Each structure stands twice: as structure tokens, then as C-alpha cells.
């Protein structure tokens, strides 16, 4: 019975999408009051994504449009069904944080069939005719992580703890990191003793991978962790092994990570202004729904096309510039961090 009901729901959703597919993409001319924005987000399990959701929704509403956000909690099938639902409801533009960069191409296909444009938010959907991509310079993120770690140690055993292999950004972070590390590796100054992706960006898996290495080699000089979640898992493993204080990078400027930086167990994080990203994306979503022209600053190839892209600059954060960066920007307060 359940399978029958699911089948009927999907069939109904697809039928409604087919009914909508009568207008070519971009032909409507709407006022802001008429615009309905759909935001399909991978997960709300990580601290930063709550911020994206809240800021994005608030900005869309400030612009006079309607918005609905659906989170898939890391499930590809759920994310595709959520996109179907929003298309069935008649959204004018779809903003997507993909769980899987390849599988999410199906969402673009469905949206275009319904005459709806797609913005790839923060993570690039691969091998699809994505209309616009907005994110940060993600190779630069990896470079910033390594450069700060090298300020503390430039020889020895290094570990690279990556993000989810299904996330295109994880590959870009690694590319940026390795572009800086490679000369040190080539001349024998640095030995990479761990180089793995972390399934689902799960801190527990990052911890397990680190513990496996430490069980055979209790001599780690630095860890490049792709984000603050994986950094937290790594630091737990290092602390258990009596290696707290080993330089560890991160990303996202999560409150827990910034507190670790103050405590000296994490070396740095990379701040990507969620205010800037979410507000910019919201404005662009409404503009695209109204069929207005969008200025982009470059293109990024996603395996199929060169996607018009807007890339914002990431900022390295250490214990020396917390006040000048994330506090000044209003992302966190002194009370949040130091109390």
C-alpha cells in the first residue's frame, strides 16, 4: 500500500510538472510580489546551514517575494522529491544546495522541463545546464588552510581529512590545498600519511579515519581538515592520543571551532560570509524569477557547460584576527565566543 501511495504521489507530481512545462524558461515577467522562490537544501544538521536558511528566507521576504525551504538531511531521493514538490507548487526559481553534485543534475532537468531556472548555491551541480552558480572561491579556501598551517609547521607528517566525495566543493578544497603542498611533498619536506574524503562530512567518520592512522603512527605534525566539523572529529582523536595542540585547519567559522581556536586546539578556520552569500543569492533568485539580467564575474565548468558564476572571497581566521573578521561582520559576538 505504501509503495502504491508513493507511486501515485510521484506520478501526480510529475503530471503537474508536465502541465507547467508550457512556457519557455525566462519568458515570464513578474513583480516581486508574484515571485515564489524554492530553496532545496542538503541538510540542516550542520550549524552553518541554519544561518544560510534564515538569512536567505529573510532577504527574499524583504524583497517582497515568497519562499519555502526544504531540507533533505543528506538523502538524494528525498532531495529530488522535495524539488518535485516545489515545482508542483509552482515556484518561479529553484535554488539548490545539492547533496550529490552528480545526482542533482536530475533536479535541473526537471526544473527546466517545468520552465524554471536553477541556481546552484554554494555547491556546484555537475553535468547539468545550471543557470547560475553562486559560491566562494573554493580552491582558495584550500590554499588558505594550508598557508596558515605552514606558518606553524612546514615539515613532517601531514594528514589531509577531506569532505564528502559526493560534494564538488570537497574536490576543489583539496585541489587548492594540494597546489600549495605539492612542492613540499616533492622535495621530501612533507609526507602525507592520510588523504581521505569523509563520508557525509561526518565528524565521527573523520575521527575514526584519524584514529586508524594514529593507531599505527603516533607522530602527526599537522592536519588539513576540510571544515570545522571534520576538524572537531580530528581534534578529538588527537586529544585521545595525547597530541592536542597539533596544528589543525578548518572552515565555516562555526562557534565551536572559533572557541577551539581561542583554546588553542584548532589553528584556523575559513570564514565565508554567509550574510553576503545568502543575501546575494536571494536577490539574484528574485531577479531571475523576474527575468532580469544578472552580472556574473566568471564561469565555472561543471563537466557539461561553463556555468555563469559569482564567486565571493573567503577570509582566513586565526586567534589574531577574530575581532576584525567574524565579530566585526556581526557573524558572532564577543559574548558568544569568550563566555
Predicted regions: what is each one?
Residues 13-339:
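A residue-level marker of the well-folded mature domains of exported/periplasmic proteins
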Residues 1-18:
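Sec-dependent N-terminal signal peptides of Gram-positive bacterial secreted proteins and lipoproteins
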Amino acid at each position: 500500500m505504501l509503495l502504491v501511495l508513493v507511486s501515485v504521489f510521484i506520478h501526480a507530481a510529475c503530471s503537474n510538472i508536465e502541465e507547467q512545462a508550457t512556457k519557455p524558461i525566462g519568458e515570464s515577467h513578474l513583480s516581486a510580489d508574484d515571485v515564489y522562490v524554492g530553496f532545496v537544501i542538503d541538510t540542516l544538521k550542520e550549524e552553518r546551514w541554519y544561518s544560510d536558511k534564515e538569512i536567505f528566507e529573510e532577504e527574499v521576504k524583504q524583497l517582497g517575494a515568497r519562499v519555502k525551504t526544504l531540507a533533505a538531511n543528506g538523502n538524494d531521493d528525498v532531495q529530488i522529491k522535495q524539488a518535485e514538490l516545489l515545482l508542483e507548487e509552482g515556484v518561479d526559481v529553484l535554488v539548490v544546495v545539492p547533496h550529490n553534485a552528480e545526482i542533482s543534475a536530475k533536479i535541473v532537468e526537471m526544473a527546466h522541463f517545468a520552465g524554471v531556472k536553477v541556481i546552484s548555491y554554494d555547491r556546484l551541480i555537475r553535468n547539468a545546464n545550471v543557470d547560475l552558480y553562486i559560491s566562494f572561491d573554493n580552491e582558495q579556501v584550500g590554499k588558505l588552510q594550508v598557508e596558515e598551517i605552514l606558518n606553524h609547521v612546514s615539515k613532517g607528517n601531514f594528514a589531509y581529512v577531506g569532505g564528502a566525495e559526493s560534494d564538488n566543493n570537497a574536490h576543489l578544497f583539496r585541489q587548492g590545498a594540494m597546489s600549495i603542498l605539492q612542492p613540499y611533498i616533492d622535495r621530501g619536506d612533507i609526507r602525507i600519511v592520510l588523504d581521505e574524503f569523509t563520508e557525509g562530512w561526518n565528524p565521527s567518520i573523520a575521527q575514526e579515519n584519524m584514529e586508524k592512522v594514529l593507531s599505527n603512527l603516533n607522530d602527526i605534525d599537522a592536519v588539513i581538515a576540510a571544515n570545522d566539523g571534520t576538524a572537531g572529529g580530528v581534534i578529538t582523536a588527537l586529544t585521545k592520543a595525547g597530541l592536542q595542540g597539533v596544528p589543525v585547519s578548518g572552515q565555516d567559522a562555526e562557534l565551536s571551532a572559533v572557541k577551539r581556536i581561542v583554546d588553542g586546539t584548532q589553528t584556523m578556520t575559513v570564514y565565508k560570509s554567509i550574510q553576503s552569500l545568502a543575501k546575494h543569492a536571494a536577490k539574484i533568485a528574485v531577479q531571475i524569477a523576474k527575468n532580469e539580467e544578472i552580472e556574473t564575474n566568471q564561469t565555472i565548468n561543471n563537466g557539461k557547460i561553463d556555468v555563469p558564476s559569482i564567486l565571493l572571497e573567503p577570509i582566513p581566521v586565526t586567534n589574531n584576527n577574530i575581532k576584525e573578521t567574524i565579530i566585526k561582520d556581526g557573524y558572532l559576538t564577543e559574548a558568544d565566543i569568550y563566555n
